[in-house]
Amino acid sequence: MVSAEVPSVEVLSAGTLLEGTEVRIVDEGRTDREERQVGEIAIRCESLFSGYFKDPETTAQSLHDGWYFSGDLGFMADGHLFITGRKKDLLIIAGKNYYPQDIERIVSAIPGIHPGRVVALGWDDASIGTQRLIVLAEVESESKVDDPALAATVRTELAGELDCAIDDLRLLPHMWLLKTSSGKIARAPNLKRFLEVFGKSAP
């Protein structure tokens, strides 16, 4: 039995597999995982591409024994494929794995935070041997920029939902965060901007 108090999130199916397509869900060692366990999605089919153009290194990393290791994370359940995120985006904080989308969803729902204008980032800190968690969140009004009460609420909500502590939280004015050409919040460019703007005061 699972308590109704346990936080959950709805995940939509990407659909069932096309005829002639095989999918495996694998761990870091590329060993198959059980159904409903999250891992990297590997695909094999007759129409699979043979490699990346003039990029043998990426080809060798992604293609092996007829399988394409996509870098996407997901799981299989009752014949349906569910995609949960990107492997490269996974945050590893003090030995625990966190999906940035989970952090962003929780913070976005807090009153005073601009919905959908939050990004959770991992910054590799060699001095402690793990990533530090950075959360950049745009606020709905200028009066909430760097507001200590709102910052405390964000930290408390995240700790309560995910048992996760933020190393560096920035409450920012609207339109501070950078987006991709498709309108999504851009992770790498925002990490770069964070380090350029706040680098000297970062933990």
Where are these regions (language model features)?
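Alpha-helical "lid/cap" subdomains adjacent to substrate-binding clefts that gate access
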Residues: M1-S13, V139-S141
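Conserved ATP-binding/catalytic segment of the ANL
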Residues: V11-R36, E40-P100
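AMP-binding/adenylate-forming catalytic core of the ANL superfamily
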Residues: C45, S50-G51, L73-L162
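Short conserved micro-motifs at the rims of enzyme active sites and ligand-binding pockets
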Residues: F53-K54, D146, S181-S182
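Short, solvent-exposed cationic patches
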Residues: K54-E57, R105, K200-P203
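Conserved C-terminal "lid"/linker of ANL adenylate-forming enzymes
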Residues: R117-D124, I134-V135, R155-P203
